Amino acid sequence: MATRIIVSYDDTDNDRDALALGRLLAFSGADLSLAYVRHSQGGALEEKEAEDLLARGAESVGAPEMPRHVVVNPGTSVGLAELAEREGADVIVFGSEYRTAPGTVKPGIPAHKLLLGGPAAIAVAPAALRDNPSVSINTIGVIDEGDPAARETAESLGAALGATVAERAGAGHIDFLVVGSRPESPAGKVTLSAASDYAVETASFPVLVVPRGRPVEFAPLAPASPSDPDESAGPAEPAIA
């Protein structure tokens, strides 16, 4: 089964960064969908506005058929957590907080709440990632917190994207970071240590925090067939759930 990724999207610039990161991860063969959390039931007009908002996001990346979810919940983080559990999602992707300087990472309130006990891996995009369409993942760093799930996730993503996994955090340049949950975190839940929280908030590249004991298994790229007329075409287009 393909990895399932949900992008939290509300048509702001920072959530366009989240969509850019989701698309980047989807080159691994993952299934991608968009989600918007409405905080009240409202009426037919509000429902249509939410659906139109998500449709614009899907169309902006040339994927009008991308699955979209409108969730009604007073809390964005709760609504997304419930959606992830219902859909069997592996990753929820966020943009950084709206006042974040370009090229840096700062989780907003919903992302931060899910970094304190969420049921799925949490990815956060640097601000203005949307403005760098040529960005790629070539070298992946790992902070494992004593949990092999972080390195297993990094190795799986590296295999899928043809990227290298650094031997240790801080060992030279990286352009993506995978972080494990702290040792006392309940199995299957995301919880950052103070040191890892600092690493996330001082990062200048996308970050993925994985639940304790539950690696994200990205699909490896299929080897090119000898008869393929264009073996140099690069990764296939991201999958749509």
PLM segments and residue spans:
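Short glycine-rich, flexible loops that bind phosphorylated cofactors or substrates
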Residues: 100-101, 185-187
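Short, conserved loop/helix-junction motifs that constitute active-site signature segments
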Residues: 24-29, 158-161, 201-202
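Intrinsically disordered or low-complexity boundary/linker segments at protein termini
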Residues: 1-17, 90-102, 106-107, 112-155, ...
